[in-house]
Amino acid sequence: MTNIRKNHPLMKIINHSFIDLPSPSNISSWWNFGSLLGLCLMIQIITGLFLAMHYTSDTTTAFSSVAHICRDVNYGWIIRYLHANGASMFFLCLFIHVGRGLYYGSFTLLDTWNIGVMLLLAVMATAFMGYVLPWGQMSFWGATVITNLLSAIPYIGMNLVEWIWGGFSVDKATLTRFFAFHFILPFIITALVMIHLIFLHETGSNNPSGISSDSDKIPFHPYYSFKDLLGAVFLLTTLSVLVLFSPDLLGDPDNYTPANPLITPPHIKPEWYFLFAYAILRSIPNKLGGVMALAMSILILALIPHLHTAKQRSVMFRPLSQCLFWVLVANLLTLTWIGGQPVENPFIIIGQTASILYFLTILVLMPLTSLFENKLLKW
């Protein structure tokens, strides 16, 4: 009798991706975050779909439609807060996933890494547009400030901003198109995830040692399927605790005030997962320079494979590079903290120092340290 799992055209794809997939025998829990990101994406699409059934993308009714979801729709409050806090979990997993790729040298899988950078940009765009939809004060002013950054582009800047707005300010047209893009982008992200996995399965996963594991592979199921299941339990437990006990912990109180173009909030700031980039943007006094630094803070990830000068792939056996990696992590946490603070001293100088150190670490210190470690190998 033929095995349907191995012969059926559709089942064969699933089998090669999630069941009989040859996996390195030594991958740690840091490799769990890929599957957790898939779980987060599923949660976001399902909850988002139910929210879209009740939401209205009109400036006069958007805020009250979100209030209606929370008050009148069956379990609407839990759907809304799962979606809002699910985004935070999504970014937490994303940052750890990228960090693991940097630490263990997964960026040497060029195609997979580049699609990953595109995915990060797509998820950030989706999250930004989603934050605008409740049409609270922070939604409106966040949209105004961030879209206005494009006016820094020479010659075409202002035309571009008004084209995105669909008028002369953030208004009904802006909200409608942001809702349309926020709805369609997760499906584009899903397609990119599939491409990401196709490229990954061409080469096979990396492992903590950074050396080839072709001689020692084990099937994905049952070993890593159960390991991923444990990670999913931890993720869902954390998300449930967040949603049920303190759903507004990561949100901004200003967003419970309906959008008012005549009153500017005292501190305009994005959600916590954008604060590091926002701090880099604010640390440069020049508008165009700030926008370029903001773009580079993410796009620099695409340069990392070309800045890799070490003979070893992973930093597991490179203590100096390990120190630099954790300096980078501490630096990003500092930038996240600074992004949420008002623009005054000493926060300005701390933000500027951390921004310089961020680019200096990635562009100069890490490649030079790797070259020095190559010399040490010969001693």
From Swiss-Prot:
Role this protein plays: Component of the ubiquinol-cytochrome c reductase complex (complex III or cytochrome b-c1 complex) that is part of the mitochondrial respiratory chain. The b-c1 complex mediates electron transfer from ubiquinol to cytochrome c. Contributes to the generation of a proton gradient across the mitochondrial membrane that is then used for ATP synthesis.
UniProt-recorded name of the protein: Cytochrome b
PROSITE patterns named in the record: CYTB_CTER, CYTB_NTER
InterPro entries attached to this UniProt entry: Cyt_b/b6_C, Cyt_b/b6_C_sf, Cyt_b/b6_N, Cytb/b6-like_sf, Cytochrome_b, Cytochrome_b_C_euk/bac, Cytochrome_b_N_euk/bac, Di-haem_cyt_TM
Binding site for heme b b566: H97, H196
Cofactor binding summary note: Binds 2 heme b groups non-covalently.
Oligomeric and partner information: The cytochrome bc1 complex contains 11 subunits: 3 respiratory subunits (MT-CYB, CYC1 and UQCRFS1), 2 core proteins (UQCRC1 and UQCRC2) and 6 low-molecular weight proteins (UQCRH/QCR6, UQCRB/QCR7, UQCRQ/QCR8, UQCR10/QCR9, UQCR11/QCR10 and a cleavage product of UQCRFS1). This cytochrome bc1 complex then forms a dimer.
Main localisation: mitochondrion
Pfam families hit by this protein: Cytochrom_B_C, Cytochrome_B
Swiss-Prot/TrEMBL keywords: Electron transport, Heme, Iron, Membrane, Metal-binding, Mitochondrion, Mitochondrion inner membrane, Respiratory chain, Transmembrane, Transmembrane helix, Transport, Ubiquinone
Record-annotated membrane-spanning stretches: 33-53, 77-98, 113-133, 178-198, 226-246, 288-308, 320-340, 347-367
Localisation: Mitochondrion inner membrane
Residue positions binding a ubiquinone: H201
Organism: Xanthonycticebus pygmaeus (Pygmy slow loris)
Recorded GO MF terms: metal ion binding; ubiquinol-cytochrome-c reductase activity
Family: Belongs to the cytochrome b family.
Transport among keywords: yes
Keyword Iron recorded: yes
Residues where heme b b562 binds: H83, H182
Domain of life: Eukaryota
